[in-house]
């Protein structure tokens, strides 16, 4: 089961809603996944989904809050590995015109009906109604990527005006959703893990929220470990390269003039470095008599390298 499907199934089990919340949630579902039909001079409205849980939720809301008794039709999807398609058809006999006005899909002016592409302010007046609306929009046209791979949550709609309205509603919760056009659709999206967590909280997907948070924590830990390993690897590489360079310089001096020509403090360090090529500067310093600190050992080895360079240049 995809993470997106898991979130939607969880959201469909949301606690009971009151009439105003039901209006907001159903309005969003109908706006993003419904089709208004006008045949034989009659209005019909079709809601289509591939998710059985969403179809059952719509059926329940229509029955309990609007007194509309309809049926869920199941259509086999012939495409390979595709889910069934669930269709809820609301006819004029079932009061579709009244429903469409109540949920803000159509508006009437002097007996003329027209589609309302905005989110009616009257159905999102309270906080719970706003949350219900965003929840419905996610159920109808939302999706979320597998957080193991990437952080991306989006809503798909076909009207730019509506997309901007929905984005503004989402952003009223201190989020930063953006709107882009993709072919013939408008996409409202969030890409930051923390903001996606906040949106899951808004729509009531608390179990999915915790799962995403766990993934975020694990990814952050892995990234921190990787950064630490990379840093230590880089430091180790520098240390090894420096040790190799020091040993080569000491051996060159030994061949050219002999280590006996070096001052005693440099000769002692040179002999220890040849004998212990893998030891750190701090450990080499402890072996000297008297002991010398890391910076002191480093200074002496730099002087040895400088002497080797001068010998190579014939100075």
Curated annotation (Swiss-Prot):
Portion annotated as DNA-binding: 280-313
Keyword Plastid among UniProt keywords: no
GO BP terms: cell division; regulation of sporulation
Signal sequence bounds: none
Any GO MF annotation of the entry: endonuclease activity
One matching Pfam family: LAGLIDADG_WhiA
This protein's UniProt keywords: Cell cycle, Cell division, DNA-binding
PROSITE patterns the UniProt entry points to: INTEIN_ENDONUCLEASE
NCBIfam families registered for this protein in UniProt: DNA_bind_WhiA
Protein purpose: Involved in cell division and chromosome segregation.
Family the UniProt entry places it in: Belongs to the WhiA family.
PANTHER family: CELL DIVISION PROTEIN WHIA-RELATED (PTHR37307:SF1)
Name the record gives this protein: Probable cell division protein WhiA
